[in-house]
A protein has these predicted regions:
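Short, well-structured N-terminal submotif of metal-dependent ribonuclease cores
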Residues: 1-45, 54-66, 91-97, 131-134, ...
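Acidic, PIN/NYN-like endoribonuclease modules and their adjacent C-terminal/linker elements
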Residues: 2, 19-20, 26, 112-158
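Short secondary-structure boundary segments
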Residues: 10, 47, 120-122
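Short, structurally constrained coil/turn elements
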Residues: 37-39, 69, 139-142
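Extended, non-globular alpha-helical segments
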Residues: 63-67, 74-77, 148-150
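Active-site neighborhoods of divalent-metal-dependent phosphate/nucleic-acid chemistry enzymes
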Residues: 73-131, 155
Length: 158
């Protein structure tokens, strides 16, 4: 049986310890607990996620790395193909150039055939305009459809 692939963006991992938004932090921690118990799910993160997380200060950085060590995940390296797809998203107006890293996350998830992207980034990821535009481009390029949800919508089953 083929495993379900789920891409976690930086905001999800960062919210494992985010005291200023306790509701999001608790929902993220619950999703993390559920992911630990799902051998049927391939968790995908990218080297871009690792680079972004590494900008956190201590002790948060050590905490997040410790949490990552508790789950089974695959790190994928950003490729030229993914950068190219991010540029296509950019040229088609999905987001502005200052959000190129966000488009790169979406491209990574798409080209690694992730069914879901999980993110707390409502401005750039988890909004109907972005999702619709990304999937229209993906369809035109014969790429897979991707759903983008916050952790709260992933709780209880996916």
């Amino acid at each position: 049986m083929r495993k379900l692939k789920v891409y976690l963006d930086t905001s999800v991992i960062s919210h494992l310890q985010q005291e200023d938004v306790p509701e999001k932090m608790h929902e993220t921690q619950e999703l993390w607990r559920q992911l630990k118990e799902r051998p049927d799910v391939d968790i995908i993160i990218s080297d871009l996620v690792i680079r972004e997380i590494s900008k956190c200060s201590e002790p948060k950085l050590s905490f997040l790395l410790g949490e990552l060590a508790q789950i089974d995940y695959k790190i994928v390296q950003v490729t030229e193909e993914e950068r190219g797809l991010a540029d296509i998203y950019l040229k088609n107006g999905v987001l502005k150039e200052k959000s190129l890293d966000d488009l790169t996350h979406i491209a990574i998830a798409t080209l690694n055939e992730c069914r879901y992207i999980v993110s707390w980034n409502f401005k750039h990821f988890v909004n109907p305009k972005t999702i619709k535009a990304v999937n229209a481009i993906n369809l035109s390029l014969n790429l897979s459809h991707v759903d983008i949800f916050p952790p709260s919508m992933m709780l209880g089953g996916f």
